Amino acid sequence: MQQTAWAPRTSGIAGCGAGGVVMAIASVTLVTDTPGRVLTGVAALGLILFASATWRARPRLAITPDGLAIRGWFRTQLLRHSNIKIIRIDEFRRYGRLVRLLEIETVSGGLLILSRWDLGTDPVEVLDALTAAGYAGRGQR
């Protein structure tokens, strides 16, 4: 059976949250100067908020009977077949490493970019599933 929902890995989100908690504890107990305490406290709060918002936005991309559901931190966007112009993979080298992004371009001119972090897997696998579901490729409705 084909996978129909993609989300960031639970371990990655938990790692960010745990790192934020450890940093917050270190900020209160280990850092003695006020500016350092404020900076590490703000960084800890940022990590905790990032982990919370990322957890809330799961699954990031899902194939539903109504269309493609793309969840963000604050809302879910539903894209029907008629709203999607093209779905493609963008590949480029960054720091000697090949990076792939899944790009979903809408008819209204919007561009949604999803990385491996967002999808929890290789974007090429997601594109294959979207092609099999009729959202991309020659069989596009």
UniProtKB/Swiss-Prot annotation:
The keyword Membrane applies. Its main location: membrane. Keywords: Cell membrane, Membrane, Transmembrane, Transmembrane helix. It holds the Pfam family bPH_6. GO terms for cellular component: plasma membrane. It is a multi-pass membrane protein. It is found in: Cell membrane. The chain crosses the membrane at residues 12-32, 35-55. The keyword Nuclease does not apply. InterPro entries: CFP-6_PH. It comes from the Bacteria. This is Uncharacterized protein MT0013.
